[in-house]
Amino acid sequence: MNKIKLVLDKKGIKQKWLAEHLGKSFNMVNSYVQNRTQPSIETLYKIASILDVEVDELLYSKDDIEQSKNKQ
């Protein structure tokens, strides 16, 4: 499960905008957002770069990330 929708909503970015910048169709991006299809690792890194977030933020909740940091 990914958090793309949460990041898009938080940043006020539309799926159409992401699709255009990613070079994918709106339907494909919508599939990612709705968790019907998972993006490839390469695409996930591109999405993170476009949205200016860490890949971890697209995959895990903030609580998961904090717990992981505290264990290190």
Language-model features: where?
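DNA major-groove recognition helix of helix-turn-helix/homeodomain DNA-binding modules
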Residues: 42-57
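Recognition helix of helix-turn-helix/homeodomain-like DNA-binding domains
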Residues: 24-38
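Short, charged recognition helix plus adjacent turn
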Residues: 6, 12, 31, 59-72
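Catalytic cores of transferase enzymes with a strong primary signal for eukaryotic protein kinases
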Residues: 1-5, 33-36, 56-59
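Short basic helix-loop element that most often maps to the first helix and adjoining turn
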Residues: 2-21
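Residues in the helix-turn-helix
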Residues: 17, 28, 57
